[in-house]
């Protein structure tokens, strides 16, 4: 038996029974002459050895559904997570960051470890013209022959999913690209019943996905009702300021309720076209709005304001973003 420090605590363990993937035992980790890479491998191996059950990790987007899920955990209606992760793109509206700061205090009060991860500021990164690689945004494209298209989306993976998965690996003790057949973690997603099409299989065999709101058949509106009934402040909409997936309803909300964010989106719409032109790698012209005109020139009036009668009521099918960024 040997005393080994795992997660800051002294534990007595038979180190010869904790094999590393290389075939060495954990006892070898405490010998001399190790490289930095071997040190990291040993640290992560010790972390995995200390786990008694898979970690429960809440993917927090700070929007309506994931916020409601967090509050339900606080109220004891859903099993609490071991960790909470928020992927910060650096380009959320100010009210979202203010809301996130309040959630951080709630998590502190209830001893929920919180991790804010980031791959950088997406707005600044995609405007670079120094020849370095930049992620593609799912902008609407006007082709030279005046046909329409849509650019491939890379922003979600690079600024949302990858940073979160990197933190997942760190928490369960896996190196980059390291595989495991063990169930090491479960990611809990705040996806509501009306967004059931967003359910996905986990990308790795050591990971499971859980969708409590879908299991309980709770819709987005029911989340808002739950927050109101329990005395919680209604969460803001969480999405990058210049996300092209916004509906006209959401662009109107941004313009009418967050004028600074709207002005930022309008500026970015012009700046992004200029950056793409300078880089010279695309023959098509990008736009944030599906109309293929600058955002500040788009007619965002409702059907009623346009004098167009809708059988199902005003903009019945244009009320909510489906949040298809995947988080």
Regions found by a protein language model. Name each.
Residues 10, 19, 25-26:
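Intrinsically disordered, low-complexity segments enriched in serine/proline and basic residues
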Residues 12-14, 28-30:
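Intrinsic-disorder-associated, low-complexity terminal segments enriched in Asp/Asn/His/Tyr and depleted
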Residues 16-17, 320:
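Positively charged N-terminal leader segments that act as targeting/secretion signals
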Residues 29-30, 42-327:
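Nucleotide-activated chemistry modules centered on ATP-dependent adenylation/adenylyltransferase
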């Amino acid at each position: 038996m040997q005393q080994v420090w795992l997660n800051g605590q002294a534990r007595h363990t038979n180190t010869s029974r904790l094999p590393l993937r290389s075939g060495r035992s954990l006892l070898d980790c405490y010998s001399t002459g190790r490289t930095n890479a071997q040190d990291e491998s040993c640290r992560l191996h010790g972390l995995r050895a200390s786990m008694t059950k898979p970690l429960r990790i809440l993917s927090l987007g700070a929007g309506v559904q994931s916020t409601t899920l967090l509050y339900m955990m606080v109220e004891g209606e859903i099993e609490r997570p071991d960790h909470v992760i928020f992927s910060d793109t650096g380009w959320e509206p100010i009210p979202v960051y203010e809301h996130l700061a309040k959630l951080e205090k709630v998590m502190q009060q209830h001893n929920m470890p919180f991790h804010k991860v980031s791959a950088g500021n997406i707005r600044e990164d995609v405007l670079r013209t120094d020849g370095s690689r930049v992620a593609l945004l799912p902008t609407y494209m006007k082709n030279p022959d005046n046909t329409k298209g849509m650019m491939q989306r890379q922003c979600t993976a690079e600024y949302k999913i990858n940073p979160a998965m990197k933190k997942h690996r760190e928490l369960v003790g896996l190196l980059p690209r390291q595989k495991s057949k063990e169930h090491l973690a479960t990611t809990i997603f705040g996806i509501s019943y009306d967004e059931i099409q967003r359910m996905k299989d986990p990308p790795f065999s050591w990971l499971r996905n859980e969708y409590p709101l879908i299991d309980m058949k709770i819709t987005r509106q029911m989340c808002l009702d739950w927050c109101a009934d329990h005395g919680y402040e209604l969460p803001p909409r969480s999405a990058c300021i210049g996300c092209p997936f916004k509906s006209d309803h959401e662009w109107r909300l941004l313009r009418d309720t967050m004028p600074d964010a709207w002005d930022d989106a309008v500026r970015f719409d012009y700046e992004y076209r200029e950056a793409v032109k300078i880089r010279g790698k695309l023959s098509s012209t990008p736009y944030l709005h599906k109309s293929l005109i600058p955002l500040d020139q788009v007619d965002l009036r409702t059907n009623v304001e346009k004098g167009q009668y809708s059988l199902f009521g005003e903009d019945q099918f244009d009320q909510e973003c489906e949040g298809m960024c995947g988080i």
